Amino acid sequence: VAGAAEGFDNDEGEAFTVNYDIRLALKTSFTGKDMLTSVLRAGNFGPSIWDEGLTFVETAMSSGGSVKIGRLFYTFPVGENLTVTAGPVVRTDDAGMYAGYATFYPSDLLLDFFTYGGAWATNNLASTGAGLGGVYKFGDSGFSVSGNYVAWDGSSTGIGRDETGSTSSWQLFYEGEVFDGNFLAQAGYAYAQNVGLTIGTNKAGAAAGDNRHGYSLAAAWAPADAGLIPSISGGWSMSDPDDSDEDIHGWYVGLEWSDVFVEGNSFGTAIGQAPKVEDDYNKMWEIFYKFAVTDNITVTPTYFIIDEYSGDLSSDYVQGAYVKTTFTF
């Protein structure tokens, strides 16, 4: 990722930076139906604007010049309809932990806020830990449910204790065909314990406290064939802190067109409101065009605007651009 932004109070915040994130996924199956997944990861995004706040990009990772274990979990079936995942380094949205994202936006993960599929309050992606989860599919109905528990510091404070930083997420998910297109929908609930807010304005972070209930609704539709009609994705989440009377809300709507000008390329844009309290203000917008240079190389120029970056009506207006290049092997 190479880019810069303006609107910050310090020169470092507006510096042009070049950052990398590299991942090596090792997947082993013992029965043909199970999967042991381990991911080695390294990156140099921090400290930079791409590694913090509302300008955080989905690929941002800082490893301090070393290679770290990004994932280590085992997924296996139980009967015909249930899939279970367990491991010491797992996240709430990993395979067998989460039924699915009700979104078709974006095809290339960019600003982190827009990658949650509207479910930022029920799918905490800030960290990994020791976890257990399962996904149950109701036959061919298109419906599935999932539930999981992740203890961020399970190796030190333990699992299931009052001091443990943890999240527990539950989801009802649907996938089917509607109006000659593909339709996704989800409703989610989560409880976070001793965990700060993953993303949001300054006031939202202060109001969130450490313990809170989260709720989310999201839906998305995509045409069966590429054309003038884009995919449409939208979602809303609310967080209800235990120690505050202020609820936290956020929403987004994203549009994406496939095979724009050239097959394999896509164009997309999204607008939304980062998690905020009632007397707060924030608006976010991004636009991108993804070039498929080859089957294994994509280049995605992106431009974004964040109105009220801090969300405290301080008139901080941030805009920026970057180019994300992805190589897959």
What name fits each language-model region?
Residues 94, 106-117:
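Hinge-like oligomerization/junction regions that interrupt long coiled-coil arms in large cytoskeletal
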Residues 92-97, 154-157:
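Short, well-ordered, mixed-charge alpha-helical segments that flank or form enzyme active sites
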Residues 53-56, 101-107, 202-204, 318:
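Flexible, surface-exposed loop regions and adjacent strand-edge segments
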Residues 119, 205-206:
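Acidic/glycine-enriched edge-of-secondary-structure segments
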Residues 264-266:
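Glycine-centered loop/turn motifs
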Residues 1-87, 112-114, 123-155, 162-166, ...:
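Beta-barrel outer-membrane channel/assembly domains of diderm bacteria
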